[in-house]
Every structure is written in structure tokens, then in C-alpha cells.
Regions:
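A general structural signal for well-ordered alpha-helical segments in protein cores
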Residues: 3-4, 21, 38, 55, ...
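Helix N-cap / loop-to-helix initiation motif
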Residues: 17, 34-35, 51, 94, ...
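Short amphipathic alpha-helical face segments that pack within enzyme cores
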Residues: 40, 96-100, 291, 295-298
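Active-site-proximal loop->helix
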Residues: 114-131
Length: 338
């Protein structure tokens, strides 16, 4: 199917099958379409509503075209990458969580970008910490193997995305590309905590990840709009484990955590975000530490290091008390600049 046919189909509210969507997305990502065609297709697809099959096919195309990071094993390999777009301006929770997971013995293939909707994206806060983002896939692989964490800067691994950047910026509305980033980890991490910007995406995205052969995943969105586990409210979860998907809700009280005020962990820029992370990593008690423990605990659980979410949070709290997450941040900063 070519893009002209696809535009007509989506405008008529017709879903594309996996093969059709593969053809269209491949033509977009290999520069065979015009900006006007890309814009028309993305808006038509968004208005129709993207299906699980369409998102899965698109993710497969992006994965195939990505500059990959090769690892000797994917045991305990996890990503903590969300869609962003919650608009609440909190510090970089999933980025902080990654260092806690590494300190717990996990392998974190952290996929991320600069800020799109927040005041500070994962790349922005890592850069503020002195980390070099522009390192080779080989060095990223070495860091994951030796330190337990590597950061994959999305533009460096998804160069095919350049064909869609112009139309996406000009449209300035959410499209399928808002969910594709976290679905296209260049190290093929089989385990994942993926936050999404809307509750309606939680279960469908878990089904997409099932179709992409993920091992253990939690897709989350909180009652207060976070694409993370919230420390202040209920979080909706779709968990993929043993090829089955279960949906449920969790609340910080379920794990003996106090409800926290999200206003206290807002960050106006990358420097403020880093300051909150450094405080939590130094052992300071408070909302920042608790929300990191909650989210890192989930990632430790899906990585396979522990058998329950509860155990993951306990492990995360131990790490935040002993300073080893800061050690991982320091080690990665040094290695990335070597």
C-alpha cells in the first residue's frame, strides 16, 4: 500500500493491517514521501485512532531501521522510558530510577531524548550531570555490561526519524510517533516500565509490547496524569508477564508509602531536576526519594531481580539509603567522557 492509498483509507476510518502499515511507515522512514503526505497521514490516523496492529507494525519498522546496541545477554535488561507529555513538569523520575536499578544489579538500556513537553527531558538532566550523550553504540554496550547502565540518545539511534521531524513539529499535535519512541529500544530490552500520557493507552500498549515479544512489562498511567507510578494517587497498570496481560491499580499506601505532594517535586529546568535527584541519592527522605523508590522498585521487579513489586521497592529503598545509586551516576559520567 502506498501513502496516497493509506491517506484515503484512514480518512475513511479504515484500519490498516500489519502489512499495509509496514509499507506506509517504511516509505515514511526511508524518505519516499513528502511532508504534506506525512502530515495528512498522521492526522488522519490520529483522528481514526491507531490500532494495536498499526502501532505494532510501525514499531517493527523503526526497530529494523535503528542503530542497535548489541549485548552478550539480555538477562535482567530493562528500560524505563515513557512517552512524556503529562504536562506536570516533575523532575526526571524514570531517569533517576535507572541508576537505582543499575545499583540493584540490573542492566538498564535507558532510551531517551531531550525535552518535548516537560521542562527537562532525560537527555537534558544527564547532560546537566556532565554525562556525554554522544557516545558510540560499542561504548554504550560496554557501559551496560560493566556499569549496569547505558543511555541511548534517541536521535543518534533513530536517524530515519529525520524524515518525520518537520511534519511533526508543524502539526504540533500528538501522533503515533509519541508512543513509538519507548517501543523502539535500540538494545531490544525485553523488560520495561513504560509510562503513557493517557489512561486509554495502558492496555493497548501492553498488547503492542506482547506483539513485539517483550518478556515482562508494566505500562502505567496515574490518576493525576503522570506517565509514571504516582506517589500522590492511584496508578493504572497493565502488566505483561508470562505472555499474559493483567490490569489493576496500585496506590502508594499499598506499599506503606505516604502520599506525597507533587508540587514539591516540580522542576523548572534540568538543573533543578538534577538537584532533586542528587538529594534523593544522598539519602534525604521526602517525596522525591519515595517516588524514585516506587518507580525503581517496579523496574527492579520487571527486570527479574526480585519476585514482587514489594521486594523491588524494598531493594530500591536500601540503595537510596546506602548511596550506591550516586556511585552509578558518577561511574557512568566518568565512562561516558572517557
Amino acid at each position: 500500500m502506498n501513502i496516497s492509498e493509506a491517506i484515503k483509507a484512514v480518512i475513511s476510518k479504515q484500519n490498516l493491517n500489519e502489512s499495509e502499515m509496514h509499507d506506509v511507515m517504511n516509505s515514511i522512514m526511508t524518505g519516499q514521501t513528502t511532508d504534506a503526505q506525512i502530515g495528512a497521514f498522521l492526522v488522519g490516523l490520529s483522528m481514526k485512532g491507531e490500532t494495536i496492529e498499526e502501532i505494532t507494525a510501525s514499531a517493527k519498522v523503526m526497530r529494523a531501521l535503528a542503530t542497535s546496541v548489541e549485548l552478550s545477554s539480555n538477562d535482567y535488561l530493562v528500560d524505563t522510558c515513557g512517552t512524556g507529555g503529562d504536562g506536570l513538569g516533575l523532575f526526571n523520575i524514570s531517569t533517576a530510577s535507572a541508576f537505582v536499578v543499575a545499583a540493584a544489579g540490573g542492566k538498564v538500556a535507558k532510551h531517551g531524548n531531550r525535552s518535548i513537553s516537560s521542562k527537562s527531558g532525560s537527555a537534558d538532566v544527564l547532560e546537566a550531570a556532565g554525562i556525554n550523550l554522544n557516545i558510540s553504540p560499542e561504548l554504550i554496550s560496554q557501559c551496560i555490561e560493566e556499569i549496569g547502565l547505558g543511555f541511548m540518545f534517541a536521535p543518534a539511534h533513530h536517524s530515519a526519524m529525520k524524515h518525520a521531524i518537520g511534519p511533526r513539529k508543524e502539526l504540533a499535535v500528538r501522533t503515533i510517533f509519541n508512543v513509538l519512541g519507548p517501543l523502539t529500544n535500540p538494545a531490544k530490552a525485553p523488560n520495561q516500565i513504560m509510562g503513557v500520557y493517557d489512561k486509554s493507552l495502558v492496555e493497548p500498549i501492553a498488547n503492542v509490547l506482547k506483539g513485539l515479544n517483550s518478556r515482562h512489562v508494566m505500562v502505567v498511567h496515574s490518576e493525576d496524569g503522570l506517565d509514571e507510578f504516582s506517589i500522590a494517587n492511584t496508578t493504572y497498570v497493565a502488566e505483561l508477564k508470562d505472555n499474559n496481560i493483567s490490569t489493576y491499580t496500585v496506590h502508594p499506601r499499598d506499599f506503606g508509602l505516604e502520599e506525597g505532594n507533587l508540587d514539591s517535586i516540580k522542576a523548572e529546568n534540568a538543573e533543578q531536576s538534577l538537584a532533586l535527584i542528587n538529594e534523593a541519592f544522598s539519602g534525604k527522605k521526602g517525596v522525591a526519594r519515595d517516588i524514585i523508590a516506587l518507580n525503581a522498585g517496579a523496574a527492579i521487579y520487571v527486570s527479574g531481580l526480585v519476585n514482587s513489586f514489594d521486594e523491588g521497592i524494598t531493594k530500591a529503598n536500601q540503595i537510596l539509603s546506602d548511596g550506591s545509586a550516586q556511585d552509578k551516576l558518577d561511574a557512568y559520567t566518568l565512562a561516558s567522557n572517557s
